[in-house]
Amino acid sequence: MNQTLLSDFGTPVERVERAIDALRNGRGVMVLDDESRENEGDMVFAAEAMTVEQMALTIRHGSGIVCLCITDERRQQLDLPMMVANNSSQFQTAFTVTIEAAKGVTTGVSAADRLTTIRAAIADNAKPTDLNRPGHVFPLRGQPGGVLSRRGHTEASIDLATLAGYKPAGVLCELTNDDGSMAHAPEVIEFAKLHDMPVVTIDDLAEYRQSQEKKAS
């Protein structure tokens, strides 16, 4: 990742700490992966703290595929089968079947409805019957170990939410340009500045976690 582009957002450690602080205060963050991987930026929110306004922003400026990043424990609690038995996607993105809240929604498409679905899925006492399948929210199963196991947006979202003191669940959506193309680092940074969102890279987060674990050992 071009560090010059990211210089306005601080050092790698500062970028992670600012992202954690933003989530802790109910704001969103932009998460970039490596230029040799997807080379995309995702809007990321802590699932527990996301607002309808933030969901509307996500739908308006994103790909439309709003994903709920959850642990495998939560996936099993909700009895969500994986979308396919044999995952042949390039980066092994671990989609489950899509979901909709069983109660409190209309068509399930609106910002409010999608947030209702997310809240139903992350509730402490959530059970499989709280969700209908299919729906308009796309759960993603994170790998145990987070970004230290897989350097994906899914794991970064869960790690950041956890570091901010929330349940291990994040909401993400890929940022797109006005013409429908995918936003890369320059456009992601421009969007982040416009919407007062920190920018952090997955590599930043992995290095931060490795450093924290070394200190703890």
UniProtKB/Swiss-Prot annotation:
Its cofactor is Mg(2+); Mn(2+). It holds the Pfam family DHBP_synthase. One of its GO terms (cellular component) is cytosol. Pathway: Cofactor biosynthesis; riboflavin biosynthesis; 2-hydroxy-3-oxobutyl phosphate from D-ribulose 5-phosphate: step 1/1. The keyword Cell cycle does not apply. The record marks H136, E174 as: Essential for catalytic activity. The keyword Lyase applies. Mg(2+) 2 binds at E38, H153. Mg(2+) 1 binds at E38. GO terms for biological process: riboflavin biosynthetic process. Binds 2 divalent metal cations per subunit. Magnesium or manganese. Keywords: Lyase, Magnesium, Manganese, Metal-binding, Riboflavin biosynthesis. D-ribulose 5-phosphate binds at R37, E38, D42, R150, R151, G152, H153, T154, E174. Its EC number is 4.1.99.12. One of its GO terms (molecular function) is magnesium ion binding. It catalyses: D-ribulose 5-phosphate = (2S)-2-hydroxy-3-oxobutyl phosphate + formate + H(+). Belongs to the DHBP synthase family. Catalyzes the conversion of D-ribulose 5-phosphate to formate and 3,4-dihydroxy-2-butanone 4-phosphate. Homodimer. This is 3,4-dihydroxy-2-butanone 4-phosphate synthase. The gene is ribB.
